[in-house]
């Protein structure tokens, strides 16, 4: 999101085949299914337990002609809350000039930031919130791209470094759903080992310390929160209902989650959630690769005995 403006800028390797606005419940359901949970067990316990955007092209569709200068407007449309364009151009400067004229507020060095993407043949997706939308949490945008091998795709997190305030960090959660296991290709990654967990009381553990250590690489690293297989779209429908029942899905729309699962037909695939916290000097585009990865349940158990201490 650009500073001082409710807008999104995203380089894409191909033109999207679908742009739509989805419900925040989709992210709530994914979080409910994959978020790490540490359960502290006590001696008396008998039970053993104590990252879319979419709507079909609208308001102009494809082929809207050339914009100002060297910028070609390839798609133009809208969702309930957003107006968006997909543009191509010859230089980062021509695209930033066009976006500025179109009302997007960009950092001073954004032309240089976009130049490598333009040189690599990327298109630029830009969306801004309609002036009629009330203030509050922004709805997720869902983009569908033509299928491609994970190794040829990267997520442009490096662009976020140009709008991150000095000294600040950015927390990222990424959901990877694919036929086969997909993991980061240019960052180290690991799951937190349940054997390293220590309960220091009936309610506290060293989980946060383990997480901080796991992402402590000077160049950045990711933690695997969950890696589940086989994934079934019914799992998301069940998860959103569980979240709502437990007060974690206020305002979420189960019907929107069902609609999302009908657009994502990868039942039986592997769902992996990775998470990190990075500074500007650690942010770079996340490349993906296929790899072997053990299944990892997001729920971990650690015993605590007040008399003997944690075991």
Descriptions of predicted regions:
Residues 1-43, 95-117, 121, 125:
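Surface-exposed, glycine/proline- and aromatic-rich loop segments on solvent-exposed faces
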Residues 2, 78-79, 166:
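Solvent-exposed loop and beta-edge segments used for protein-protein assembly and interaction
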Residues 15, 109-311:
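Accessory, solvent-exposed terminal regions and/or long lumenal/extracellular loops of proteins
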Residues 39-41, 45-103:
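Single conserved position on a long alpha-helix in the C-terminal lobe of the eukaryotic protein kinase
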């Amino acid at each position: 999101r650009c500073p001082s403006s409710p807008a999104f800028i995203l380089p894409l390797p191909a033109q999207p085949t679908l742009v739509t606005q989805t419900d925040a419940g989709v992210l709530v359901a994914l979080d409910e299914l994959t978020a790490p949970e540490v359960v502290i067990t006590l001696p008396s316990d008998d039970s053993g337990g104590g990252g879319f955007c979419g709507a079909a092209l609208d308001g102009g569709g494809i082929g809207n002609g050339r914009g100002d200068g060297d910028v070609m407007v390839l798609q133009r449309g809208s969702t309930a809350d957003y107006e968006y364009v997909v543009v191509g151009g010859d230089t980062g400067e021509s695209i930033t000039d066009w976006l500025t004229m179109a009302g997007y507020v960009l950092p001073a060095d954004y032309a240089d930031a976009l130049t490598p993407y333009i040189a690599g043949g990327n298109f630029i997706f830009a969306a801004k919130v309609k002036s009629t939308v009330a203030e509050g949490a922004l709805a997720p945008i869902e983009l569908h791209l033509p299928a491609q091998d994970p190794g040829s795709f990267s997520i442009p997190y490096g662009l976020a470094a140009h709008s991150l305030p000095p000294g600040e960090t950015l927390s990222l959660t990424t959901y990877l759903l694919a036929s086969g296991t997909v993991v980061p290709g240019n960052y180290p990654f690991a799951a937190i080992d349940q054997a390293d967990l220590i309960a220091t009381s009936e309610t506290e553990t060293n989980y946060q310390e383990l997480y901080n250590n796991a992402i402590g690489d000077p160049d950045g690293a990711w933690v695997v929160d969950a890696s589940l297989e086989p994934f079934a779209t019914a799992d998301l429908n069940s998860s959103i209902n569980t979240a709502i029942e437990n007060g974690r899905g206020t305002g979420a729309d189960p019907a929107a989650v069902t609609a999302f699962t009908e657009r994502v037909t990868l039942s039986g695939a592997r769902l992996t959630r990775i998470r990190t916290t990075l500074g500007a000097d650690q942010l770079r585009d996340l490349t993906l690769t296929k790899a072997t990865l053990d299944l990892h349940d997001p729920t971990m158990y650690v015993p605590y005995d007040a008399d003997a201490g944690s075991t």
